[in-house]
Amino acid sequence: MEPIPREVLDAANSKSRRLRELVRAPEILVMPGAYDVLSALLFEQMGFKAIQGTSGGIAAALGYPDGEAISRELFVELSGKFNAAVSVPFNADGERGYGDENGVKETVRALVAAGVAGMNLEDGAGRKRGGARELVELSEQLRKINAVTEAKRALGSEFFLNARIDAFMVMADDQKKALDEAIRRGNAYAEAGGDCIFYLSVHSREIIGRLAREVKAPISILAGPQSPSVNELQDLGLARVSYGSAFLKAAIGGTRKLAREILENGTVTSLKEGMQTPEINALVTKKNRN
């Protein structure tokens, strides 16, 4: 594997170490989902300690559906831009890793070269509207996680891996089966090198608590309107919480509200609720001074 310049690798490793420290800290890590550079800048300004990329939000903002619809090259380019804009760790949403084990290695190397702290790697397959249709075989996903470890070793990288499990989405009709599979995979992924185990479609306090107790790694969930509060999640033992494309949804919802007001009333009073030009300019000016 082609080496990465030492100064680039050192900078990436510094952010990877920081992200790992934050996930292992006593206080739960809250990671908002950036869908463009401006949202990443805003999150850093507001005091978030790390930022998550949202594949669904980024794809939608570019006019694509979720699910590796954008190329690896574009994904890496955008992830690098997000990372360069902020000083806090940025974790990319690597979806399924862009290919088999060799593809995963290429993705990891490209992200490290872009200075990115880490990535999500998911085990859902057979996309359908709203999520995965099935889980990839455990052995196949373990090969991908091992590929991440091998790439890190070859590069001298401390890249962070957030291993995502889609069991609760795929097995929504059988929560007991989903929980058993979620625990089994969580421990297997952690043993193979996952730094954090990330679950979707789980909101039950009882289930979240069991995951935190029975999976031998830091645990994270994707939060939604049904989820417990951040304080409750910390009390349940979670290490991390993220929000996927929630902020893109909020932004496009605000755009629709203003557009509807113009069409129906010919006014723009709801614009008062938005961020004003001086605030936006202050964000991007700070970025361009760094």
Name each model feature, range by range.
Residues E2-Y243, A250-K257:
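Alpha/beta enzyme core
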Residues M1-A12, L19, A246-N290:
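Extended, intrinsically disordered, low-complexity segments
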